[in-house]
Structure formats: C-alpha cells, structure tokens
C-alpha cells in the first residue's frame, strides 16, 4: 500500500518512482481517490525533475491500462494494426488520405482522433462537415468497420485512457502542460489503447507547431519513439514542416474537399503529398507491408492511381453514416460559405515567412474552430488557394481566397492574413517538407 503524498515527496526530492508507485497514483487519478491538489503537485515535480525512460514507459502504460485496451485478435485480421498521430498544425489534413491509402495497401487503421485545439484544426471537426458522418459508432460497429473497410476515424470515448482526461485537465490549469514526459504519456496512452502493432508520429516544427522550437520538437519526437518502443509498439517519428499552411486550404469543409481531390487525383498540393507519402511509407514499413521506401512508395502510388484509396475513403464515409456517393458528389454535400473572395497583399514581393499559428487562429475567429468546448463550428468557413513560401506576389496572385459568413468576418480575416504573411524583395531559401526521421 502506498501513500500519494509519499510518492509526491519521493519525486520532489529527485528520486525515480517505481512502476508500482506510478500505477498506484494513476489508478487513484482514475478512481478519484487522489485529489486534484495531489495531481497538481506530482505534475509540478515531474515538470521540474523530469522522468527516466523506465518511469516514462511506466507512466504511459499505467495511463493506457486505466481504461479499455482494444484487442483485435478475435477478428483474425490479415494485416497489421497501424496508426499515425500528429502534434497538430494548420491545413494538416493528412489523416483523411493516409488512413484510406494504408488500408488500401493491406493495413488496418483504427484511428481515434481529436477535435481542434487552439490554432490547430481537428480531424473530427473536419469529418463532421460531411452530412450524417458518425464519429461515435459503438464498439461493435467500430470493429465491424475496421474489419470490412480497413479504416475508421472516430472520437475518443470515455473508456479509453480515462486517467489521462483528469490528469490533463489539472495540468491545463497548473502550467504543467509543456512537460515532455507528461505530453508523451498523454499522447501515447490514447494511441496505445488502440491495440497497435505499429505507430508513426508526425511532430510538427515551425511557426504553426505545438512545440515552440525545433529542439523541443525533436526532444518530444525522440521521447515518443523511445517510450512507445519501450511499451512494445514499433514506432518511428518524422519531424515535418509547419512554417506554412500544409495543404492549399485551412478550415473544415474546404480541407475535406481538398482531401477528396487528393485521393481522386484531381489536385495534389506538392508539400501535402510529400508529408502524406512519407508518413504512409513509415506505416507500411513498420507494419511490415513493405520492405523498404521504394516498395512502399510504389504500393501507395498504385492505390492512388487505380482509385482504390479513394474507394476506401468513400466506403469509410458510407460505413460511418455519411452519403454513399460522397466521393463522386462531394460538392453537393459539403457546406459552402456565404461569401468567397480573394485577399491581395498591399505590396509586391516574395513570401518570406508566414505566422502559421495566426492563420490558424484566423480560421477559429471566423467560426471554423472553438474558443471553448461549447462553441458550435461553422464548417463552411476557411481559406483556399493559400499562397506558399517563396511565391511571387503581385496584383494578380492573391494571398488566399477567404470563405466567410459575411463581409465583416471577411474583412477581419483579410486583416489577419495580411498581417500573418511577410513579403520580402528576394525569395527565401526553400525548406524541406520532412526534416528528419527518428527511429529507436
């Protein structure tokens, strides 16, 4: 039998906690036998003293085991259970293409996703722009869709990693969110509860990233790869660029439209293609569906070219109660904003920098995201035809097309876009889409 205050004292004094001590504390968070004050105290001691790798693995697995852990063995699936997690960005619509692409190559992708957070868009919010789309199928239906279609994207239910929800709520109000062991545990507890064979992490870097510097993004990626492999799940991470909006659009319906166009081959933004392909390659290799990069890319290109990936996306939408002809008739179903017009820069030059976070917040301000959990989302608003770093801007080339609910909202967004995009008289050096691959 342990005492919560003794566990806090031990960590406060700089000692490593045992697996049993960590499990006792996390189970107490779940069972409400540990107070909010005690959670806050432990979070702060971890913030200042960090955690060893064994402690980080124990924390993550204890949070995973605080609720249901999905088990796919009874389905006798003929491929690996694989998933991707992103730290979030703007125009980061990769999940909508990646899930179907990997499923079309023989993987099974039970993606438990999130809503928008701060300036970052949420995959669930994007999918809810599709009429009827059900993000909370019951457990049996979720399993059926995975078995039949190969991919489902759903919201987190209360049975998955429940200790994390309470732990995170306390961290949020005690300035202990930005602790690498605690971020790692929070992300991985939910992902590992999916019962995965392999995972790829997309850790963003730059002005729209969750972590403020390249070094911190790198440290988070290394921590996640170390802990997830320590917990028995083959995991790699990619550091990818978020110094500009990833897709050509940012919003909900506008990003779903771009995802369908990507899958059908109607339009593929080059940077979005690079990042999506790189993440899919990791999933195929870690899931042992391809032996190397070249084989993985060939398989992925084939399912894009032969329409199989688009077909899987359509089947997923239908299985989750969306329209059965969504891929063919997406424009009929997706909401469109009352006002759509381009915004132009006041001067000419090359785009040298972008405040991606500010662009994400501009979408939220237009109604495309939530400032608080109770807010309703306007799925139609956002940006399309986003200009990119290095583009030459003059009176002909707009910075973006803004889709707004009215003129006042358009004007406010136009001001934000102009302020967030910096022009210079010479073009900047190009930045890679993927900076680094991190393995154990």
From Swiss-Prot:
Signal peptide positions on this chain: none
Its EC number(s): 2.4.2.4
Top-rank taxon, per record: Bacteria
PROSITE patterns in the cross-refs: THYMID_PHOSPHORYLASE (PS00647)
Pathway where it operates: Pyrimidine metabolism; dTMP biosynthesis via salvage pathway; dTMP from thymine: step 1/2
One GO term of the biological process aspect: pyrimidine nucleobase metabolic process
Residue ranges crossing the lipid bilayer per the database entry: none
Catalyzed reaction equations: thymidine + phosphate = 2-deoxy-alpha-D-ribose 1-phosphate + thymine
SUPFAM superfamilies in the cross-refs: Nucleoside phosphorylase/phosphoribosyltransferase catalytic domain, Nucleoside phosphorylase/phosphoribosyltransferase N-terminal domain, Pyrimidine nucleoside phosphorylase C-terminal domain
Keywords in alphabetical order: Glycosyltransferase, Transferase
Entry GO CC: cytosol
GO molecular function: 1,4-alpha-oligoglucan phosphorylase activity; thymidine phosphorylase activity
InterPro entries per UniProt: Glycosyl_Trfase_fam3, Glycosyl_Trfase_fam3_N_dom, Glycosyl_Trfase_fam3_N_dom_sf, Nuc_phospho_transferase, PYNP-like_C_sf, PYNP_C, Pyrmidine_PPas_bac/euk, Pyrmidine_PPase_CS
Enzyme class, first EC level, given as a word: transferase
Family note: Belongs to the thymidine/pyrimidine-nucleoside phosphorylase family.
Subunit note: Homodimer.
Summary of the function given for this chain in its UniProt record: The enzymes which catalyze the reversible phosphorolysis of pyrimidine nucleosides are involved in the degradation of these compounds and in their utilization as carbon and energy sources, or in the rescue of pyrimidine bases for nucleotide synthesis.
Listed name of the protein: Thymidine phosphorylase
Species, as recorded: Salmonella typhimurium (strain LT2 / SGSC1412 / ATCC 700720)
Gene: deoA
């Amino acid at each position: 039998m342990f005492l919560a205050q003794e566990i806090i004292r031990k960590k406060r004094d700089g000692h490593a906690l045992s697996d049993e001590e960590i499990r006792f504390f996390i189970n107490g968070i779940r069972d409400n036998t540990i107070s909010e004050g005690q959670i806050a105290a432990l979070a702060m001691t971890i913030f200042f003293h960090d955690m060893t790798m064994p402690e980080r693995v124990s924390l993550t697995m204890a949070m995973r085991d605080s609720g249901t852990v999905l088990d796919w063995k009874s389905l006798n699936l003929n491929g690996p259970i694989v998933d991707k997690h992103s730290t979030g960005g703007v125009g980061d619509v990769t999940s909508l293409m990646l899930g179907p692409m990997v499923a079309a190559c023989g993987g099974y992708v039970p993606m438990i996703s999130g809503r928008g957070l701060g300036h970052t868009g949420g995959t669930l919010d994007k999918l809810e722009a599709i009429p009827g789309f059900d993000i909370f199928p019951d457990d049996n239906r979720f399993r059926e869709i995975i078995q039949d279609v190969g991919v489902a994207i759903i919201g987190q239910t209360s049975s998955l990693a429940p200790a994390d929800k309470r732990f995170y709520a306390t961290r949020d109000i005690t300035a202990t969110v930005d602790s690498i062991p605690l971020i790692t545990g929070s992300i991985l507890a939910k992902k590992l509860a999916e019962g995965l064979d392999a995972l790829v992490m997309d850790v963003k870097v730059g002005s729209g990233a969750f972590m403020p510097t390249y070094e911190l993004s790198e440290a988070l990626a290394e921590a996640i790869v170390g802990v997830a492999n320590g917990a028995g799940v083959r995991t790699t991470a990619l550091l990818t660029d978020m110094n500009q909006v990833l897709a050509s659009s940012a919003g909900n319906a506008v990003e779903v439209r771009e995802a369908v166009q990507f899958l059908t081959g109607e339009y593929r933004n080059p940077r979005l293609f690079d990042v999506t392909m790189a993440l899919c390659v990791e999933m195929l290799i870690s899931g042992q569906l391809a032996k190397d990069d070249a084989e993985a890319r060939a398989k992925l290109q084939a399912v894009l070219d032969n329409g199989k990936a688009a077909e899987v996306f359509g089947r997923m939408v239908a299985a989750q109660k969306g329209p059965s002809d969504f891929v063919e008739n997406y424009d009929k179903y997706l909401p469109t904003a009352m006002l759509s017009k381009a915004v132009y820069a006041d001067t000419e030059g090359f785009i040298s920098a972008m405040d991606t976070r500010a662009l994400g917040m501009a979408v939220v301000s237009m109604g495309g995201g939530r400032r608080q959990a109770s807010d309703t989302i306007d799925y139609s608003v956002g940006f399309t035809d986003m200009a990119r770093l290095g583009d030459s801007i003059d009176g002909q080339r707009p910075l973006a097309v803004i889709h707004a609910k009215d003129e006042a909202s358009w004007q406010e967004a136009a001001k934000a876009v102009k302020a967030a995009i910096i022009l210079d008289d010479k073009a900047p050096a190009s930045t890679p889409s993927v900076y680094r691959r991190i393995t154990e």
